[in-house]
Amino acid sequence: MAAPAEIKTEYLLPNHEGPWTLDDVLSLPEDNSQRIELVDGMLYVSPLGTAAHQRLVFEASYALRGACPKEFETTIELNVQFDGDRLFIPDFTVLKKRGAKGLTVPAADVLLIGEVISRSTKVKDVVVKRQVYAEAGVSYYLIIDPAKDVPKATLLELGEEGKYVEIARSENGVLTIERPFPVTIELPS
C-alpha cells in the first residue's frame, strides 16, 4: 500500500466552526486556483473553469466591453456582495458606473451579471444565483452554456414581478441583444 501524497496546505481551507461570514471569507489568503463564494454561511468552492470556459468568458466580456457605453464598466471575476453574508464571483459583470474600488462591489452597483455554466456549477448558476441576483435587483443575467456542440447563451431581464424573463437567445453561436445596450457576442466553440 502506498503512502498518501503530501497535501499542499495552501489550497486547503482552514478549520472553521459554525457558519462562515463575509469577513471570514475576505480574510482567507488569496488563492488563484479556485473560487470561494458564500451563501448564508456556507461556502461554495469550485475550481477555475477549463480553457473552453475561459475563452467564452473572454469573448463575452470583450464584446460587452467594446459596446459598453462610457458610463458603464465591464469587469471579470469581481467579488459582488449581496444582502446578508452572500458573496459571488461572477465570470463577468457590467457595472452601472466606472471606477469601482475596494475588495467587494455591492450588488446594487451591478447592471448585468454573466455566468458560463459548467457541470460542477450548473445548479448553483441556474437556480441559486438566478434567485439571489433577482432578489438583489440585478437587471440582467446572461447565462452561457458551453455543453453543446455550439455554445448557447440566454439573456434574462428582471421583470416587474421580481423574476427573470428571457429576452434574447443565441442562434448558431451568436447572441445579439438590444438591452442593456446593443451588442453582438460571438460564442467560440
Question: What residue ranges belong to the model's regions?
Answer:
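Gly/Pro/Ser/Thr-rich low-complexity, intrinsically disordered segments predominantly at protein N-termini
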Residues: 1-189
